[in-house]
From Swiss-Prot:
Keywords: Activator, Aromatic hydrocarbons catabolism, DNA-binding, Plasmid, Transcription, Transcription regulation. This is HTH-type transcriptional activator NagR. It comes from Ralstonia sp. Belongs to the LysR transcriptional regulatory family. GO terms for molecular function: DNA binding; DNA-binding transcription factor activity.
């Protein structure tokens, strides 16, 4: 069809319905009445010859064709919005903006202290809120702007997202300094004989450790499994268990909990830690500023 047959305002309504899945909510956010939104949807359906959204018990569900249109429409509207607002600026020292960042507990331990120290000097009124990448629907939350940036190994963030490599995690074995039998460098035989504490970190690269070890024919004597890395330090401090952890995490635990590390006896691949943001906010001045700060503070490149 010819682009001249489409009213740009109809695409704005389409985009809002994609985000809210509700005619009334979309109308409220756009400053339109519910009948006006319904009429816009009717016109767009006629122009595109598709229902686009179907009313269900869960709200207005997009059709396959609507989902096919979603990314290019969102990208086009965002590009146009950026072009119209290029004069906007971001003053970090004066800003009171809250940035929502998705990361694991390891991410909080590694990223937050240097980030908050830098913000205290450069952006004293900015607030940071963190959440887990698997706490909800991360793709939708980043598309809607509810989450500004995500950090980690997040293979689900592909189409519609930009990413920047920060560094690579190397795995090590960690245990208490006065462990009766664990030594560095640790052999595969010793690694297999000792008892382990493991972390089930779903939807992160760290959740692949068991699979990597099994494919290498290495079995762990798993004594304890926990859902968060944050518990590993205190547990190793008071037990004879050992753990497979990222090296940067180990550095933060060694002194506070009296721990030490050994190069990992298994040839585990490094884990790439990337910074992700949605294409809609690629030119958002505040998002750009915070991304650059992360690169400055944490990038190995």
């Amino acid at each position: 069809m010819d682009l001249r047959d489409i009213d740009l305002n109809l695409l704005v309504v389409f985009n809002q319905l994609l985000l809210d899945r509700s005619v009334s909510t979309a109308g409220e956010k756009l400053g339109l009445t519910q009948p006006a939104v319904s009429n816009s949807l009717k016109r767009l359906r006629a122009a595109l010859k598709d229902d686009l959204f179907l009313r269900t018990s869960k709200g207005m569900e997009p059709t396959p064709y609507a989902l096919h249109l979603a990314e290019p429409v969102i990208y086009a509207l965002n590009t146009l919005q950026t072009a119209l607002t290029t004069r906007d600026s971001f003053d970090p020292f004066a800003s009171t903006r809250t940035f929502n960042l998705a990361m694991t507990d390891i991410g909080e331990m590694y990223f937050m202290p240097p980030l908050m120290e830098a913000l205290a000097q450069r952006a004293p009124h900015i607030q940071i809120s963190t959440l887990r990448p698997n706490a909800g629907n991360l793709k939708e939350d980043m598309e809607s702007g509810a989450v500004d940036l995500a950090l980690g190994l997040l293979p689900e963030l592909q189409t519609g997202f930009f990413q920047r490599r920060l560094f690579r995690h190397r795995y090590v074995c960690m245990f208490r300094k006065d462990h009766p039998s664990a030594k560095s460098p640790m052999s595969l035989k010793q690694f297999s004989e000792l008892e382990h504490v493991g972390v089930v970190a779903l939807n992160t690269g760290h959740g692949e450790v068991d699979g990597l070890l099994e494919r290498a024919g290495i079995k762990r004597r798993m004594r304890l499994v926990v859902p968060h890395f944050i518990a590993i330090g205190p547990i190793l401090h008071s037990t004879d268990l050992i753990a497979t952890v990222p090296q940067r995490f180990a550095v933060r635990c060694e002194v506070p909990f009296g721990l030490t590390t050994s190069p990992h006896p298994a040839k585990l691949p490094d884990i790439a830690i990337n910074l992700f943001w949605h294409a809609k906010y690629n030119r958002d001045p505040g998002n750009m500023w915070l991304r650059q700060l992360f690169v400055e503070l944490f990038s190995e490149a």
